[in-house]
């Protein structure tokens, strides 16, 4: 099994993700090779919470240019995690 901190990369802090926190939904960037079960197990191991549901979205790379040099952004994978009603909140989002 992989280390849980390799699966969960960073929290996503946007206006929409902050509004979803009232419904106990938290948003994270995750490893592109991870699946829903790995994301659930990693969050339960790192933060000690109970996960009810995991939704995952894939973002394709976008073409970008800097002057005459063209390239692509990195592909991303984002997970929206819903906690159970009796679960505690994730502390990483408290001061934001």
Swiss-Prot record:
Gene Ontology terms, MF aspect: rRNA binding; structural constituent of ribosome
The UniProt entry, under Pfam families, shows:
Ribosomal_L23 (PF00276)
Give any Gene Ontology cellular component: ribosome
Q: Name one GO biological process term.
A: translation
Q: What does this protein do?
A: One of the early assembly proteins it binds 23S rRNA. One of the proteins that surrounds the polypeptide exit tunnel on the outside of the ribosome. Forms the main docking site for trigger factor binding to the ribosome.
**Per the similarity annotation, which family is this?**
Belongs to the universal ribosomal protein uL23 family.
Please report the name of this protein according to its UniProt entry: Large ribosomal subunit protein uL23
């Amino acid at each position: 099994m992989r280390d849980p901190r390799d699966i969960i990369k960073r929290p996503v802090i946007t206006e929409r993700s902050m509004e979803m926190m009232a419904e106990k939904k938290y948003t994270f960037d995750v490893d592109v090779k991870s699946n829903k079960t790995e994301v659930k197990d990693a969050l339960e191991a790192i933060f000690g919470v109970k996960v009810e549901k995991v939704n995952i979205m894939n973002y394709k790379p976008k073409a970008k240019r800097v002057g005459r040099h063209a390239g692509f952004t990195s592909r991303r994978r984002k997970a929206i995690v819903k906690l159970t009603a009796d679960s505690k909140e994730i502390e990483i989002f408290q001061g934001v």
